[in-house]
Amino acid sequence: MKNTLKLIFFVLLLFALFVSLRMFIDVAFYSDVIGIKDVSILGIISILFTVSAFLIGCVIFLENRHPSKTLTWLIVLGIFPVFGFFAYLLFGQNFRRKRMFQKKALLDEQAFLQYKGHEDYEERILRNHKHQELLFRLADRLGALNISFQTETRTLTNGDETFQAILDGLKRAKHHIHMEYYIVRDDKLGTEIKDILIQKSKEGVVVRFLYDAVGSFKLSKSYIEELNDAGVEMIPFFPVRFPILNDKINYRNHRKIVIIDGNEGFVGGLNIGDEYLGKDKYFGFWRDTHLYLRGEAVQSLQLIFLQDWFYMTGEAVLAPEYLQAKAVEGEHWGGVQLVAGGPDNKWETIKHLYFAMIASARKSIWIATPYFIPDDDILSALKVAALAGIDVRLLMPSKPDKRTVFYASRSYFPELLDAGVKIYEYEKGFLHSKVVIVDSDLASIGTANMDMRSFHLNFEVNAFLYDTDSIRKLVQDFKDDLEESSEIHVDRFHKRRLHRRIVESTYRLLSPLL
């Protein structure tokens, strides 16, 4: 044991000295540019970076991260010491995460248990969804909220249909409106929503609005002030004033939630902005998917919002008036389950449910996602499913909005294609849907991408659907999207140019950090 510790200490010290040497060379080389000519100052900088690199190396090692993440951070720090040092301070530090989110996790668990029904769904599940029993049990143990069989769901295709439904719903509000968004724009759509919220607030409707401080950093102060002055409570999620000193910058609220009077809700991939209506010159047509809910399951969506609200404001509003969603009677609705994922989860809830969905497949697995940075578990599950003869299809955009993620995603294509996965690139515009469909009777719609950031860092929310009418529309939409896509063929893809392979491999190396 002592020899092992000595070896670890020696390796970390060598790593720190290497980073320091790189730093010394870089600073010396650019000394004229940055105005440092005194050798003693260079020496002090070098010593400081030696100590910092050693301490960071120790922290990375002791955090017991996944080996790929540990190795990636050490490589980045070694090759790009200055960039790596500040990148780690911004995005890499993980040692306060447990303490930061421990209280929220406990409060969420208590609230979810308090409002989790005691109905025994087991007989109904076993009768209608025997092969998905494992998925139901897993969701229950991971802390997911109730499965509702008395909720109407409707798939909303693209921005026009989605925002027309949302605007109509906001106008119907009589008691309260709760909204939670990653990106809010001060443009035509944003202004239209703002005007409705102001009018509703004047009518006495309670309006609460959470927006992510980083995702909506371009949102004007006048937009926020106008809403606040009208009585709308507009609250930022994790505001960031000094990014380098604020480790919250890496944990963002990626959720998109609208709740109207506690009985109607919306969740999915669309943020608030004109580009989501296809009005961006670069992207053009914007392909996205949202879900409308009416009935019992809206209570689960409400709980997720109210717990986020309490986390940011300290205002506890778990009152019965907000949690009285009415069941929609009928035997044909199918099952709906809302699942919250985030850095406050002990288990990576959404990732594990994706994995269980893939593992439960008997005929088909269809995935639409704008970003594909899977971890080893998801990647292996998809390859094994394809090798077993299951129809595995992956639909992605043909043009990037984030080049690093785009090329890193493509680095996974060769091994997937070799295993028999069919990969398509959507060419009509930009594909932003976050959809998983298994065997045409099990699906997920939500905010979580098929990437490590959604699995580990972002606050997300997904609706898992079991044999609902909305799944049938999802299946048809997916088929329609394939008509607007081109299939990537394995032979042709393996012949792509060398510089593309190098770019993809380079970004693949950084994929644990993306």
UniProtKB/Swiss-Prot annotation:
Q: Mainly resides where?
A: membrane
**EC number of this enzyme:** 2.7.8.-
Report if keyword Ribonucleoprotein is assigned: no
Organism of derivation: Bacillus anthracis
Q: What is this protein called?
A: Cardiolipin synthase 2
Q: Which GO terms describe its molecular function?
A: cardiolipin synthase activity
* NCBIfam families per the UniProt record, alphabetical: bac_cardiolipin
* Active-site residues per Swiss-Prot or TrEMBL entry: 254, 256, 261, 432, 434, 439
Question: Where's the PLD phosphodiesterase domain?
Answer: 249-276, 427-454
Q: Where are the transmembrane segments?
A: 7-27, 41-61, 71-91
| One cellular-component annotation, GO | plasma membrane
Q: Which family does it belong to?
A: Belongs to the phospholipase D family. Cardiolipin synthase subfamily.
